[in-house]
Each structure stands twice: as C-alpha cells, then as structure tokens.
C-alpha cells in the first residue's frame, strides 16, 4: 500500500511560538491523513495541463484543511541526471513541458488562496553535498533551460512564493546571489512575493533562535 502521513506529524502544536498556523495539541483533526498521489514526473508524462491543474487544486484544498498558508512546490528544476534523488519532485528534462505543467499546477492551487512557491531556485540537481556544491553553466543554458520553469511560474501563473536552493550558483550561495535574485527574479521577472531559503536543517538553529 501507499503510506499517508497524518497532519499531526507536521503541524506545529506549540501555541506559544507565535505561529499563526499553530494547531491545538488536542485538535481531533491531527489524526487526519493526507491523500497520496503520484509524483510530478508521472503527471508530466501525461502531457495533460488540465490534469496538472486539477492536481494543483487538490493540493490547494489540502493546504486549507491542514491550516497551511504556503505550499512549497511545485518543483521546477530539470532532470539533468537519472540519479538525482529529487527527480520525483521535478517534471522532466524538458523546459517547455516543465513550464506548462508548473503554470497549470500553480494556477489551480492559487484558487484556494494559498501561496504556491515553486522550488528550488536554481539549478538543484543532487542530494550529495547539496548544501554547498557549486553549479556552473553558460548563461544561455540557464536562460533557455534551467530557469524557464520558474520564470513561467512567476510571469504566467503569478506565483507568490519561491524557495531558493541550497547549492551555489558559481561560487555564490543561491540565496545570496544578487544577479539571480535581484536582477533576474525581481528585476526581469517582476517577482514581488515571498522568497525563502530551503528548509532549515541545522540542529543548532533552535539554540541560535533562543
């Protein structure tokens, strides 16, 4: 069978945290389980934008049920290698197919008032050393292929969130790259939404926060 995660596994039940989406620890809905669907690669293989749009609507609706204001997806990176552990989060190796599917998905999810945030900007392609690996490519490769999924998500679907990648663009961390985030993302594409680094995995973060 396919395992489905309960809401309680992810929900913040610490009401003192100041989190507007915190849930009461005794809330009976914590036992609610999410439905499990096929991944983005399978959706893309249908070449069906209507299906991708329905998929987005389901995820948007789930976000309301689970008290989420932001849905961190869809994945708009390309498959550059069959060995990338995140390929299930990305549609395909083709920039045009990826763009069409992402736009349809985001448009569907937005109908529920949820911020849909495509990821990982930009060039994520490996889980090994992903928090510091340097990615190099020509500007033509970046603009014609790697960036097009995210660009379409913003320009054509009006995505209001973006998650940046852990890797480096050249030798600069993606979340600190002025050319990528200021000049291209906000300057050329006109993005005015929420920009977030990938999920915090440092165990010292809680200590630093205190």
Predicted regions and their residues:
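Glycoside hydrolase catalytic-domain context in secreted enzymes
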Residues: 1-210
């Amino acid at each position: 069978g396919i395992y489905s995660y309960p809401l309680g596994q992810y929900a913040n039940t610490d009401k003192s945290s100041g989190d507007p989406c915190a849930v009461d620890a005794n809330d009976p809905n914590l036992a609610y389980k999410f439905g499990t669907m096929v991944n983005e690669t399978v959706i893309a293989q249908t070449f069906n934008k209507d299906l991708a749009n329905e998929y987005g609507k389901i995820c948007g609706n789930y976000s309301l049920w689970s008290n989420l204001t932001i849905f961190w997806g869809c994945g708009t990176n390309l498959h550059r290698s069959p060995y990338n552990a995140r390929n299930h989060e990305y549609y395909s190796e083709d920039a045009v197919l990826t763009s069409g599917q992402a736009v349809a998905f985001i448009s569907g999810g937005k109908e529920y008032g949820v911020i849909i945030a495509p990821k990982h900007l930009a060039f994520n392609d490996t889980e090994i050393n992903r928090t510091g690996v340097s990615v190099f490519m020509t500007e033509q490769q970046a603009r014609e292929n790697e960036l097009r999924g995210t660009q379409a998500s913003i320009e054509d679907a009006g995505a209001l969130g973006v998650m940046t990648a852990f890797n480096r663009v050249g030798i600069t961390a993606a979340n600190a790259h002025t050319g990528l985030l200021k000049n291209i993302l906000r300057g050329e594409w006109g993005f005015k939404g929420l920009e977030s680094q990938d999920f915090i995995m440092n165990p010292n973060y809680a200590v630093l926060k205190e």
